[in-house]
């Protein structure tokens, strides 16, 4: 990579995680599908157990509560997204792997992720609409991902060069807003391909900020 900036996929200080047995993994896969397609509040433990082919007792033995199932659902999806994004950024060809190119690659990665995993938009944004209480253990997963994305955009903006640190931080925040707004528009299906539109706007922002 041209910049040498490593994209960390780890999350720190997150909620407690559950050790996964095969039955727990089946339950988590069912919960992910149901929560994402129907919403967290609309899905009960009975339905998750039935879809996974496990008993309610098994669910409670493994997870302890529906709250913890929600935590595992979001944390698992977050981990997979971070790994996917890091892989996509690492794949930017070295001669072209400038910070600006990697910023645009974030939008490309989100577009690819949404094509395969995101018919209803961002799972974190959707979950936050249902779980706004900061005391809910899943809240840390949701905000943790968004803070991580902000740090990624800001770090790449600083690496782009040609602008002072304060301007780079503002650029990072603006790129974050573009990205998150496009995710919401994707879920709402307001207009076609909002992430491609956001990428074009990001390119224009970068050109204006760095003169390249």
Q: What are the residue ranges of the model-derived segments?
A:
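Generic hydrophobic, amphipathic alpha-helix propensity
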Residues: 23-32, 48, 73-81, 85, ...
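N-terminal intrinsically disordered/low-complexity leader segments
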Residues: 1-22, 210-212
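Helix-turn-helix
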Residues: 26, 30-68, 72
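Amphipathic alpha-helical packing segments from all-alpha helical-bundle domains
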Residues: 79-86, 101-105, 120, 134-159, ...
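Hydrophobic/aromatic-rich alpha-helical bundle segments in the mid-to-C-terminal region
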Residues: 137-147, 159-205, 209-212
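Hydrophobic alpha-helical connector segments
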Residues: 72, 86-116, 171-175
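Amphipathic alpha-helical segments used for helix-helix packing
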Residues: 116-136
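Amphipathic, non-transmembrane alpha-helical scaffold segments
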Residues: 20, 28, 70, 74, ...
């Amino acid at each position: 990579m041209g910049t040498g900036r490593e994209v960390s996929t780890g999350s720190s200080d997150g909620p407690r995680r559950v050790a996964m047995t095969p039955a727990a993994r089946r339950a988590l896969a069912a919960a992910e599908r149901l929560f994402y397609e129907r919403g967290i509040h609309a899905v009960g433990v009975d339905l998750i157990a039935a879809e996974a082919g496990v008993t309610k007792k098994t669910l409670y033995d493994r997870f302890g509560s529906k709250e913890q199932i929600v935590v595992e659902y979001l944390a698992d999806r977050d981990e997979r997204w971070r790994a996917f994004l890091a892989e996509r950024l690492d794949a930017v060809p070295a001669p072209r792997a400038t910070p600006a190119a990697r910023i645009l690659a974030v939008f490309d990665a989100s577009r690819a992720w949404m094509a395969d995993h995101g018919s209803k938009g961002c799972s974190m944004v959707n979950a936050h609409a249902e779980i706004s209480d900061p005391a809910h253990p899943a809240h840390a997963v949701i905000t943790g991902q968004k803070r991580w994305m902000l740090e990624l955009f800001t770090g790449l903006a600083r690496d782009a060069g040609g602008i002072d640190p304060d301007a780079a931080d503002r650029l990072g925040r603006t790129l974050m807003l573009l990205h998150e707004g496009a995710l919401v528009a994707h879920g709402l299906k307001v207009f076609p391909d909002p992430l491609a539109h956001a990428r074009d706007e990001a390119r224009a922002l970068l050109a204006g900020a760095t003169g390249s």
